[in-house]
Amino acid sequence: MKLTSLFIFVIVALSLLFSSTDAAPGKIPVKAIKQAGKVIGKGLRAINIAGTTHDVVSFFRPKKKKH
């Protein structure tokens, strides 16, 4: 357990040393994030429509009798 915590501590220390501390908001691809959000939204809508269609069809379909 102590070896794992020591390893994590070393990795965190190295990442703090080698990472830049300045934020660069100009480098964030806002258009790509918006486009991905639209695609994900359309996918979720399609899943919702498919689920609703399945519910409606299963409601009106006659149920099979079990033996």
Swiss-Prot record:
Location (main, coarse): secreted
Subcellular location: Secreted
Keyword Signal: yes
Entry superkingdom: Eukaryota
Phylogenetic classification of the source organism: Eukaryota, Metazoa, Ecdysozoa, Arthropoda, Hexapoda
Alphabetical keyword list: Antibiotic, Antimicrobial, Immunity, Innate immunity, Secreted, Signal
Name of the molecule in the record: Moricin
UniProt KW Signal keyword: yes
Primary role: Antimicrobial peptide. Active against a broad spectrum of Gram-positive and Gram-negative bacteria including methicillin-resistant S.aureus ATCC 43 300, S.aureus BAA-39, pathogenic strains of L.monocytogenes, K.pneumoniae, E.coli O157:H7, S.typhimurium and multidrug-resistant S.typhimurium DT104 with minimum inhibitory concentration (MIC) of 1.4 uM for all except for S.aureus BAA-39. Also active against Serratia marcescens. Probably acts by disturbing membrane functions with its amphipathic alpha-helical structure. May protect a developing embryo from bacterial infection.
Signal peptide start and end residues: 1-23
Protein family membership: Belongs to the moricin family.
